[in-house]
């Protein structure tokens, strides 16, 4: 794609097609600046009467630990601001980072996803260090939803949303790599030069838990949607084949 706007519109079309083909779809959603444009485009399509969220169930990738939902930096707040408050979705789920028994919450979250029939389509952004969800570089891939310690680079990247770095939560509850890979279809979005290296490692690198997104190579239905800057470290022929794959039919 040429730019962020084009990337967002393309991603929104893929999600809209999913909802039209299967109105009771189970969506896997992400937060952060990358999918914001996609959500805005979906709200627009909803307002035009093209899509309906009445029978949709959604599960978010992650939520900060010990940050109340009403805090304007919580992912619950983000989702309401950018999507949930603007469409007719009733059955949405986020991990609860305020519970005392985190392990039980993680297990319950996995069970809720399974009970809903699994995720039909999952949107992902990617961190500069290759993280997806809050699955940070590690010596092993963590399979299921879990409590994660955020790395200094992630805390620094997220500090732009907080008054100071000290205020950024140091932990989060996140779907595991195994949870993400169980999704039937995955849409990976990346925009900007800052993501180019992570994308190149994801596409060309060995599968390595130090670059969590490389696990996506194990999935048989991943659509990668990039703007030109994020694709700048890919070989032209690979970028063109990715563009071809991600063209909405």
What are these regions (language model features)?
Residues 123-125, 168-201:
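Glycine-rich anion-binding loop/nest that anchors nucleotide
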Residues 146, 204-242:
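Accessory alpha-helical/coil subdomains and C-terminal extensions
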Residues 1-108, 112-115:
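N-terminal active-site beta-alpha-beta segment that forms phosphate/nucleotide-binding
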Residues 29-34, 124-128, 191:
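Glycine-rich beta-strand-to-loop/alpha-helix junction loops that act as flexible
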Residues 57-61, 190, 223-228:
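Short internal beta-strands
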Residues 241-249:
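Residue-level detector of conserved catalytic or cofactor/ligand-binding positions
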Residues 107-140:
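Internal active-site segments that recognize and position negatively charged phosphoryl groups
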Residues 129, 133-177:
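Class I SAM-dependent methyltransferase SAM-binding "motif I" and its flanking Rossmann-like core
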